[in-house]
Regions:
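Short acidic/polar mixed-charge low-complexity motifs
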Residues: 6, 35-37, 61-62, 75, ...
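C-terminal substrate-binding/catalytic lobe of Rossmann-fold NAD(P)-dependent oxidoreductases
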Residues: 49-51, 57-60, 64-67, 88-90
Length: 139
């Protein structure tokens, strides 16, 4: 969303689908940006679905990333799929360390913004979907 249009609130429902993953293994949330745009966030480690999917629909088109492919409009390309964000994050951290320069995308502020989304989702879910005001989404 960016610094000029940060997320400002989030409302979520949470549940535990798998007995061995307490207390919560699934989050379904709706987030609202400063300009009023809304979007959904769905994260589950308890579902039977395999893989991950990311879709962003905007005024000028749609971008989808799923199973090693990225689609922008009608054009689809293969991309490197490492099954999680961990290897690229560690690689970027190592490159920044070797260069002696911090990676802005791995700043404490970025981490705080990510943590805030997860914590707000859990708190909202505990309160039956009550909207939570977000404070740390501007970076």
């Amino acid at each position: 969303m960016g610094p000029e249009n940060p997320l400002v609130s989030l409302s979520a429902y949470t549940t535990q689908l798998q007995e061995h993953l307490p207390p919560v293994d699934t989050i379904d949330a709706t987030a609202k940006a400063k300009n009023g745009a809304t979007g959904t966030i769905s994260i589950s480690f308890g579902t039977t679905l395999s893989g991950s999917e990311l879709t962003v629909a905007c005024q000028d088109g749609v971008v989808s990333v799923t199973h090693g492919k990225i689609s922008i409009g009608n054009k689809t390309e293969e991309i490197q799929d490492e099954r999680s964000g961990v290897p690229p994050e560690v690689r970027a951290w190592g490159e920044a360390l070797a260069a002696g320069k911090a990676n802005e995308r791995q700043s404490p502020e970025e981490a705080l913004a990510d943590l805030e989304l997860i914590e707000a989702s859990l708190r909202s879910g505990e309160q039956g979907g009550k909207p939570i005001v977000l404070q740390y989404q501007t970076w």
